[in-house]
Amino acid sequence: MADEAIKNGVLDILADLTGSDDVKKNLDLNLFETGLLDSMGTVQLLLELQSQFGVDAPVSEFDRKEWDTPNKIIAKVEQAQ
């Protein structure tokens, strides 16, 4: 999958989960500090990433610091491809 397709797919997932297009405008937005993503949203995010991109990121190994911005999430998905 092309990087642009991954980026757009991740941003669409984040926009749906957060209910905000801010995630598409500011790729360095801290999703947790802004309250756009919480623990339940995190579980939904990981399930969507696994379903759409085959990313296997167990909740038990999830580190918020590594997944706290759209850019970091996109990078994680690209690494898993």
UniProtKB/Swiss-Prot annotation:
It holds the Pfam family PP-binding. Its main location: cytoplasm. Pathway: Cell wall biogenesis; lipoteichoic acid biosynthesis. Keywords: Cell wall biogenesis/degradation, Cytoplasm, Phosphopantetheine, Phosphoprotein. One of its GO terms (molecular function) is D-alanyl carrier activity. 4'-phosphopantetheine is transferred from CoA to a specific serine of apo-DCP. The modification O-(pantetheine 4'-phosphoryl)serine is found at residue 39. One of its GO terms (biological process) is cell wall organization. One of its GO terms (cellular component) is cytoplasm. It is found in: Cytoplasm. Residues 1-81 form the Carrier domain. Belongs to the DltC family. Carrier protein involved in the D-alanylation of lipoteichoic acid (LTA). The loading of thioester-linked D-alanine onto DltC is catalyzed by D-alanine--D-alanyl carrier protein ligase DltA. The DltC-carried D-alanyl group is further transferred to cell membrane phosphatidylglycerol (PG) by forming an ester bond, probably catalyzed by DltD. D-alanylation of LTA plays an important role in modulating the properties of the cell wall in Gram-positive bacteria, influencing the net charge of the cell wall. This is D-alanyl carrier protein.
